[in-house]
Amino acid sequence: MEIKCSERLIIPKEYKTELDLKETAIAIKEVKDCFERALAKQLNLIRVSAPLFVRCDKGLNDNLNGVERPVKFTVKDDNEAAVEIVHSLAKWKRMALYRYNFNADEGLYTDMNAIRRDEELDNTHSIYVDQWDWERIIKKEDRNEEYLKDIVRKIFKAFKETEEHINKLYPFLGEVLPEEVFFMTTQELEDMFPDLTAKEREDAITKEKKAVFLMKIGKTLESGEKHDGRAPDYDDWELNGDILFWNPVLNKAFELSSMGIRVDEESLLKQLKLANCEERKELQFHKMLLEKKLPYTIGGGIGQSRMCMLFLKKAHIGEVQSSIWPEEMIKFCEEKGMTIL
């Protein structure tokens, strides 16, 4: 049975935005400018230009959960070469670090735009994706959990700095982040809440802790289920995670970032086999990785519009980004006090 868009929406009781359209536009820029500077400083990153589309035969696009269809087209003046709009730049960034000759503990970030045509549209999901995609070179010996946690803490400092900046400009919005981030694995979370679904578990722990880094996503848990899917060829499933914040407007856990230490040659082979995707070994990116030509890296994506939603207390992602929405959803949101851009 088809589910109406309005039935997927969370409608906060007596919702009323604190900022009008013009004020929102100004505040969005404040959020983005502040966080971009803070992230670059914390992680020693420089900004680089990023592609909107990549060639299909290079293996550079992010396959996400493995079922999402990329938008494809051909280029007339390049012998009708097949290209596809990116889902994210997870693999492209690692290749870029190699080409730019970055050193260990240096990295890059991009202002990434993507189209995810198969997203189910609701308060937090849009077919238009805008995020900071970042990647940083690490040493082989840095491929461990403590290094991962250290990077997460640095990113959390950038979040805190941004929230404090926005709260000085708009004190009536209030702050939502705690003083520190809480770390937990997906298996520990399943053990704690065995009778809940994955999303219900995230809600339960994030409501309590307010800021959580949920680790080890993509692997099969003791229950025989995965907490969530991850492509086998960028994150190491033992060394990755999601940054979750409690969203008081929507009353649910809110994913702001998916990130991780990237696969090395051993974990790539292992995960490709587990995912039944061993044919990818013949793609350019994968060949270079297996031949140890690419640097060891850590990286992730951080949602720009979701961050604006959280800090500006917005109930729908369409209040902070311009995208395409069903007319039914636009009308329903307007009736409930959510002005879609």
From Swiss-Prot:
GO terms for biological process: L-asparagine biosynthetic process. It is an enzyme of class 6 (ligase). It catalyses: L-aspartate + NH4(+) + ATP = L-asparagine + AMP + diphosphate + H(+). Keywords: Amino-acid biosynthesis, Asparagine biosynthesis, ATP-binding, Cytoplasm, Ligase, Nucleotide-binding. One of its GO terms (molecular function) is transferase activity. InterPro entries: aa-tRNA-synth_II, aa-tRNA-synth_II/BPL/LPL, AsnA. The keyword ATP-binding applies. Pathway: Amino-acid biosynthesis; L-asparagine biosynthesis; L-asparagine from L-aspartate (ammonia route): step 1/1. It is found in: Cytoplasm. It holds the Pfam family AsnA. GO terms for cellular component: cytosol. CDD domains: AsnA. Its EC number is 6.3.1.1. Belongs to the class-II aminoacyl-tRNA synthetase family. AsnA subfamily. PANTHER family: ASPARTATE--AMMONIA LIGASE (PTHR30073:SF5). This is Aspartate--ammonia ligase. The lineage of its organism: Bacteria, Bacillati, Bacillota, Clostridia, Eubacteriales.
